[in-house]
């Protein structure tokens, strides 16, 4: 909506490209032989949760920006003015949508032929794992809160800026706790989104 393009088409395209970038393969262990086999055509549930959060955000940004660029360059199917607006919007999204899907598909094929194997592995190794290590530590939490207040002192909404980067990390850590709890194990993370909501952000940033 900010870019004055079809928000519904852009949102749907973000979902489609995320699924396209996700490898539809799951490892299955045969109970009788304990042998692990790769099953094709199955949605990996793990990548639909915290593991796929960063990938979903990055793919959504890429697909939206690419869609916006193509639409604003008028690379679309133009319909006569007598055609209803809903039909016009549908046809206008066809060419940009096809181009975006093709770009993401080619990107996936290229990455699958590297040592990484998938976009999820790249994001996990380069971005998510380092941020998770930082975000899960006490010093990381302290630095994040201090940075929030430094930004506020400059007249910038610090919670929004820092939260935009770190919230996916803390939500991911919270989801790891959920998985461990459901499995009857000790929860591994103290610093999570709930930790900030209960002990730091009550009444405002820094317990104001």
Locations of the language-model features?
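Cytosolic juxtamembrane amphipathic/interface segments immediately preceding
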Residues: 79-89
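Pore-lining transmembrane helices
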Residues: 1-70, 76, 91-208
